[in-house]
Amino acid sequence: MPSKNDLLSFRSEINNIDKNIVQLLAKRKKLVLNIAESKIKNNQPIRDIEREKILLEKLTNLGKKNNLNTNYITRLFQLIIEESVLTQKKLLNKFCNDNNLDLASFSFLGPKGSYSHIAASQYAEQNFKTCIENACLSFNEVIQSVENNQTDYAVLPIENSCSGFINEIFDILKKTNLFIIGEINISINHCLLAIKKIELNKIKAVYSHPQPFQQCSYFIKKFPNWKIQYTNSTADAMKKIVKYNITTNAALGSELGSKIYGLKVLYKNLANKKKNITRFILLSRKPVSISSKIPTKTTLIFNTGQESGALAEVLLILKKNKLIMKKLTSQNIYKNPWEEMFYIDVQANLSSSLMQETLEKIGKITKFIKILGCYPSENITPIIP
């Protein structure tokens, strides 16, 4: 059995190996940027799927020879390849739009510690050197701050894997003149938080935004005596229970928020589905130009009126033009319940002749159509060896 000194020696060696791994990843990233510049210069696509497959196959075979699990090597290098693609996309976007990536300001539903704050921080970290944060009290205030030229970008949650599309955002998108210029997916870990450790049956009131209550409904139903208190955001809920300082109060919020507000985590991962992801969109006053070399989405809303089969015709146009629909949802039109407004994500670049032709055809059979934006797709399809 190894002695304590042996254990410390082994751990020290592992620490050195981990340090070398990080340094090699940093060196790899520099080479990736050189490759991206070469691709831009020679007008080459960001991804080379065949090369990625060959690379991953060689690495998994090398892993086998060194007694490493194939799944482990696959997952590790899928993540490394994904980071390489995102790095190249960022550089290409800067080239296409001549953007200053040093500083940007973001508005989000606050206060700090909300999931919108987390999304804004992660997007800013990926794309800018410095971020100025503006926490807002409502989604409308988030939009207005950008419309009024107070901040550069608005961050809004648009759909959740547990609770679906957020209708309040649908209403905002119909009215605003801003454009969707990006998206980011955030893993949501709803936690039950309190001022101090407390037994669940002693909790009297739980505070949070309506969405977490909906996403954690299975857990909440187990405690019918809890009084549900709705707040503007999860972070607002955390601030409230700190302010009230009542030990029988609790909040649904993020683990990051618990650290910001000094709360105790009673339970983690309370969502109805284990994989709970919220998709956020970024909006700006100006649309962005997206290279044809980048996987892209175009988002639009339209109203077919009361014409029978009009939606089917729209979908048929997409099918005939071999365009992939990534999302379709609808909402009844206020004061006219017999009509619906449709929201659709199409895997295509707005500037392509095929997409322009498609929009022209759709425009002829719809009552209303609005392009919300064209932007890089957040999801990088992983390579399977």
UniProtKB/Swiss-Prot annotation:
One of its GO terms (cellular component) is cytoplasm. Its EC number is 5.4.99.5, 4.2.1.51. Residues 299-376 form the ACT domain. Residues 105-285 form the Prephenate dehydratase domain. Pathway: Amino-acid biosynthesis; L-phenylalanine biosynthesis; phenylpyruvate from prephenate: step 1/1; Metabolic intermediate biosynthesis; prephenate biosynthesis; prephenate from chorismate: step 1/1. It catalyses: chorismate = prephenate; prephenate + H(+) = 3-phenylpyruvate + CO2 + H2O. The regulatory domain shows changes in the ESRP sequence, which is involved in the allosteric binding of phenylalanine. These changes suggest the desensitization of the enzyme to inhibition by phenylalanine and would permit the overproduction of phenylalanine. This is Bifunctional chorismate mutase/prephenate dehydratase. The lineage of its organism: Bacteria, Pseudomonadati, Pseudomonadota, Gammaproteobacteria, Enterobacterales.
